[in-house]
Swiss-Prot record:
Pathway(s) the chain acts in: Glycolipid biosynthesis; lipid IV(A) biosynthesis; lipid IV(A) from (3R)-3-hydroxytetradecanoyl-[acyl-carrier-protein] and UDP-N-acetyl-alpha-D-glucosamine: step 6/6
PANTHER family xref list: TETRAACYLDISACCHARIDE 4'-KINASE, TETRAACYLDISACCHARIDE 4'-KINASE, MITOCHONDRIAL-RELATED
Gene that this polypeptide is encoded by: lpxK
Keywords annotated in UniProt: ATP-binding, Kinase, Lipid A biosynthesis, Lipid biosynthesis, Lipid metabolism, Nucleotide-binding, Transferase
Protein name: Tetraacyldisaccharide 4'-kinase
Length: 332
């Protein structure tokens, strides 16, 4: 299900629908605030939360990959703990890409497990304990910002600069899980991801933020594939599939068809056969995202190309300083 357009109007000019739903949004915000009062588990190692205020995709997975790699470069064994959205296993269980499928552990943990130890746990505190017992020197808590079950030592809120915080209202009147002021009041850093023009608009729309802001962009990982003039049928089931389609066009690919699927939508045999037939009729190559690729049926894994992206931060200084304060530095 795609988010409604009225979620992303200017905050100063809310739509009629947003105004009508505002009481429900206030009730949602109040429920979140009550939930956040609960006591959390204090881990024995630093816990870094990568979260967002918006419902849906903002770039948390590329951020988690970047932080895993940065901590690894510092000699820190960081483990990811995720709820495993879309998977059926309750955990805690360490994700094994050779054994697990997305239907069991979720697509994001399965992708993240290629970059470092990843755990799935419905009970995040239990997942943190399991990771600690397995030797984690730091925990990356994936999408747990509104979950109070684990105490966070560093919270990084990620936002897509192209859409910002939408109309600034809470679900269902807008895209927010909690009000901007309250959410950023608990955060340590804000990371806005997007190209220069999107960053400029975000800064203009949200000029007075109570938290230091980092900026970055998603850059295509060069894998030797020449996308120039490549005829493709692209499909994506992520938070904002149009970002993926735009990245392909920026690489020079010719999108003969772009199919936006629901976020985390299962990629069953019937759907993939339909897309394959359409691609053959168009003389096009099937292309998807890394996150979607882990949900592909085995029979299609050699038939579909991916366009990997990685987060490039403009300046790591603030994050490196935060890691230093937490004692996350190479020793010996």
């Amino acid at each position: 299900m795609r988010p409604p357009a009225f979620w992303f109007t200017q905050p100063a000019r809310p739509s009629v629908a947003a105004r009508l739903l505002a009481p429900l949004g206030r009730a949602y915000a109040a429920a979140t605030a009550r939930r956040l009062r609960a006591e959390g588990h204090r881990a024995g190692v630093p816990v870094i939360c990568i979260g967002n205020l918006n419902a849906g995709g903002t770039g948390k997975t590329p951020t988690a990959i970047a932080l895993l790699q940065r901590l690894s470069d510092r000699g820190v064994a960081a483990h990811v703990v995720s709820r495993g959205y879309g998977g059926r296993l309750e955990g805690p269980v360490q994700v094994d890409p050779r054994r697990h499928r997305a239907a069991e552990v979720g697509d994001e943990p399965l992708l993240l497990a290629a970059f470092g130890p990843a755990w799935v746990a419905r009970d995040r505190a239990a997942g943190v304990r399991a990771a600690e017992a397995a030797g984690a020197q730091a925990i990356l808590l994936d999408d747990g910002f509104q979950n109070p079950s684990v105490v966070k030592d560093l919270s990084v809120v990620v936002v897509d600069a192209a859409v910002g915080f939408g109309n600034g209202r809470c679900l269902p009147a807008g895209p927010l899980r909690e009000p901007v002021a309250e959410g950023l009041g608990r955060a340590d850093l804000l990371l806005s991801i997007g190209e220069a023009e999107a960053q400029r608009r975000f800064a203009a729309d949200w000029p007075a933020l109570p938290v230091p802001r980092l900026t970055g962009r998603l850059a295509t990982l060069q894998m030797g594939m020449d996308w120039q003039e490549a005829r493709v049928l692209a499909f994506a089931g992520i938070g904002r599939p149009e970002k993926f389609f735009a990245s392909l066009r920026a690489e020079g690919a010719v999108l003969l068809r772009a199919e936006a699927l629901d976020d985390h939508q299962p990629l069953g045999e019937a759907l993939m056969r339909r897309l394959e037939i359409e691609a053959m009729a168009l003389g096009a190559q099937l292309v998807t995202t890394e996150k979607d690729a882990v949900r592909l049926p085995p029979s299609f894994r050699q038939k579909v190309l991916t366009l990997p992206v990685r987060l490039e931060l403009d300046d790591w200084t603030a994050l490196d300083a935060a890691f230093d304060r937490l004692g996350l530095r190479r020793t010996g």
